[in-house]
UniProtKB/Swiss-Prot annotation:
Coiled-coil ranges (or none): none
Family membership: Belongs to the UPF0473 family.
Name assigned to this protein: UPF0473 protein GTNG_2486
Pfam families registered for this protein in UniProt: DUF1292
Length: 98
């Protein structure tokens, strides 16, 4: 994972690079990890309804000029916490649109 200001380059298991935009990051004291919500920048990332799939990973930030590392979400408890954070984010976005 490479960091830009608001972009990261994600490399999949096949070695393909994909530019993604960071939606937001947060830290969890309960799990002692940082997390990032991100989505692909390319138009091909949209589904047939025009929706863009958002991904989430734990991450270890890199030092100033070093790459960081994306990590998988490991437990059901982490997924529950992430879902709660996502739902709060979506509710706040909807309130801002009104």
């Amino acid at each position: 994972m490479e960091h830009g200001d608001r972009h990261i380059t994600v490399v999949d298991e096949q070695g393909n690079e994909q530019l993604c935009e960071i939606l937001f990051t947060f830290e969890s004291d309960d799990f002692g990890k940082s997390y990032v919500f991100y989505y692909p920048v390319s138009a091909e990332a949209e589904d047939e309804d025009g929706e863009t799939e958002v991904h989430v990973s734990a991450f270890i930030p890199g030092d100033e000029n070093e790459e960081g590392e994306l990590l998988p979400i490991e437990t059901e408890e982490e997924w529950d916490m992430i879902e709660e954070v996502w739902n709060t984010f979506c509710a706040e976005q909807e309130e801002g649109e009104e």
